[in-house]
Amino acid sequence: MLDLYPVQNLTVDQLEYEKNTRFLQPAWDWIKNGNEHILSSPLFPPFYALSIDYTWVAVFTFIDVFLCNVPFFKDAKIQKDRKVTWDLIKKSLKLQGWNQLLWIYPMALVQLIWVPDTELPILAPTVFEMLSQLAIFFLAFDFTYFWFHYINHKVKWLYRWCHSVHHMYSSPFAASAQHLHPFELFFVGTFITTIPWIFPTHCLTYWIWFFIAQSVSYEVHIGYDFPFALHRIFWFYSGAPAHDMHHLRPLTCFQPWFNYLDRLMGYHITYADLKKMTEAKFKKFGLYSAEDEKGLIKIN
């Protein structure tokens, strides 16, 4: 689909002018130089995406297992009474491995066979083009996934069959971000992959979108509230504390990245709000009944 990026029918002089005036052109030329055969391969997008996954998991697994008692990380831990152990991490990695064998690698093979090489444009995208498209992709995914997520919680048979797999963990950590039922992985992966198809999207914009979408999805699962976290700057951004709350109280904080829909619909709640509740309300707020969760597997 990236071949839909418009071909610029420019004269030599016009092309040189555009190359000299586009802010991202030096970076685009540097990225392409000598790497064309890799970047144009239909295998590049899936393995690029996997490399982002593996990096987040590797970094925060090291932090969770070996640095959890370092004061900086200990203070930033949201659910301080929950320790991330190697046994917990292995359970998530095992499911991720099966999901990759079921979906990721077969889809990579399909792309290798049927998808032509990506045509790498000569020109970089303009800054406005890239930023405006990334903003639209971000808003579109956040809005759409909110409703997918909301329905998965409100339709009980769907929750029990599909989304409860992700909620085996009430205290998330980076490796649990991809602890998903295959159906949910397919939906989320397909939407992240195809949403840029609504525009003629430059492949550089496409790759940056992949990085942002996956990184934000991991960031909200890390289980740490760092002093530099984005939610401390932008009130409309959920961040790790909101999604941590969602895992602890699964009928709250449905929106994945922003929080405006949760605020409008009364689902946004903080740990400070919990402390203000009466004991009776605290015991039930945002939780399923014991009957609703009967028979579901809980890992932590």
UniProtKB/Swiss-Prot annotation:
Its EC number is 1.14.99.-. It is a multi-pass membrane protein. This is Cholesterol 25-hydroxylase-like protein. A motif (Histidine box-3) lies at residues 242-248. Residues 135-266 form the Fatty acid hydroxylase domain. One of its GO terms (biological process) is sterol biosynthetic process. Pfam families: FA_hydroxylase. The chain crosses the membrane at residues 54-73, 95-115, 130-152, 192-212. Its cofactor is Fe cation. It comes from the Eukaryota. Glycans are attached at N9. One of its GO terms (cellular component) is endoplasmic reticulum membrane. GO terms for molecular function: C-4 methylsterol oxidase activity; iron ion binding. InterPro entries: Fatty_acid_hydroxylase, Sterol_Desaturase_Related. It is found in: Membrane. Its main location: membrane. A motif (Histidine box-1) lies at residues 148-152. Belongs to the sterol desaturase family. It is an enzyme of class 1 (oxidoreductase). The lineage of its organism: Eukaryota, Metazoa, Ecdysozoa, Nematoda, Chromadorea.
